[in-house]
């Protein structure tokens, strides 16, 4: 048997089967150290070693043995229970959670998206185990996170790597760009929770490499030529709505507006999210896109998508709270 598994039950079974031999070796090594140092007293130490159980050994001692790698699919039934079982089992485990889809409907007839449910929420849940190292990142950001990845691999306790690697076919973008846009739009932000960094959640938690983390949405300048071929520069926010626009399954929630109807009734999605209009008819939200003729166009967004963007923003705001940052700052002020 090896040390790589695609389900938690098989990994736990292998670990428990090998545990007696591991404990025997640890006892023998500990006994040998005492004998070499001339400190072994049979009447004192022999009963102690005879009564040792698995819980008497620490994660640091178990790290001399190979870790168990468990690869999980976030779409698999019961993945939340499997993940909790793996991280609380005491097994030296590295869990790779592969997130393929962030925009799947929660259930037929429900007007909500389960975006990030199997990714961000599972990774956030893992932080509650305290001694677990947690890293979440889009696949496009893994190179930038290599130092954190190495820390997670060296961590003596359980480790979770939650990675968004989008499946081909759903997005109009190549996989690498789809992953990058998920992180850019706050749909799948990168963060880490490292128990080795300090005693409290605020020092352990870090928002990793997210663009402009102090604002709701990253802002960039776009320069384009208008109808008179004059250069126009506009500041744009890349929101969750922009991420949604690239997903073919949700095209029915968008509509291109002919240039002749670019009137005062349209407001940018960024403006709508900052201050939703009381009367929807007076402020239809839109995002910019490029059509097949490489011309800039405006695409209006229905309210359902805008509400999904609001929930995405709320989840982004909750991340520091989950990491204990705000609570620790409040305690410091008191």
Each model region followed by its residue ranges:
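Anionic-ligand anchoring segments at beta-strand to alpha-helix junctions in alpha/beta enzyme folds, i.e.
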Residues: 2-44
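Core active-site phosphate/anionic-ligand binding loop and the adjoining beta-turn-alpha structural block
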Residues: 90-206
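Thiamine diphosphate
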Residues: 28-110, 120, 124, 133-152
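Phenylalanine-focused residue identity feature
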Residues: 3-5, 40, 49, 57, ...
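Flexible, low-complexity linker and terminal segments
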Residues: 1-19, 169-334
């Amino acid at each position: 048997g090896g040390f790589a598994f695609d389900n938690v039950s098989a990994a736990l079974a292998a670990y428990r089967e090998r545990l007696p031999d591991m404990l025997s070796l640890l006892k023998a090594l500990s006994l040998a150290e005492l004998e070499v140092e001339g400190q072994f007293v049979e009447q004192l130490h022999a009963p102690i070693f005879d009564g040792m159980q698995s819980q008497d050994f620490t994660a640091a001692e178990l790290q001399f043995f190979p870790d168990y790698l468990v690869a999980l699919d976030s779409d698999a039934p019961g993945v939340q229970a499997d993940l909790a079982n793996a991280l609380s089992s005491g097994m030296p485990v590295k869990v790779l959670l592969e997130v393929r889809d962030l925009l799947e409907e929660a259930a037929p007839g429900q007007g909500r998206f389960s975006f990030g449910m199997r990714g961000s929420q599972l990774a956030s849940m893992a932080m509650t185990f305290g001694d677990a190292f947690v890293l979440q990142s889009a696949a496009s950001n893994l190179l930038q996170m290599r130092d954190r990845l190495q820390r997670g691999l060296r961590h003596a306790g359980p480790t979770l790597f939650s990675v968004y690697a989008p499946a081909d076919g759903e997005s109009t973008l190549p996989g690498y760009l789809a992953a990058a846009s998920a992180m850019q739009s706050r749909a799948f932000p990168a963060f880490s929770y490292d128990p080795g960094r300090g005693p409290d959640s605020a020092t352990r938690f870090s928002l990793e490499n997210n663009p402009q983390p102090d604002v709701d949405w990253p802002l960039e300048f776009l320069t384009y030529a208008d109808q008179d071929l004059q250069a126009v520069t506009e500041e744009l926010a890349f929101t969750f709505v922009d991420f949604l626009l690239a997903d073919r399954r949700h095209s029915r929630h968008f509509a291109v507006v002919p240039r002749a109807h670019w009137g005062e009734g349209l407001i940018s999605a960024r403006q709508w999210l900052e201050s939703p209009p009381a009367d929807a008819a007076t402020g239809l939200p839109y995002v910019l896109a490029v059509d097949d003729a490489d011309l800039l166009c405006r695409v209006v967004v229905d309210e359902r998508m805008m509400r999904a963007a609001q929930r995405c923003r709320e989840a982004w705001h909750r991340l520091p709270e989950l990491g204990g940052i705000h609570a620790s700052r409040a305690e410091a002020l008191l």
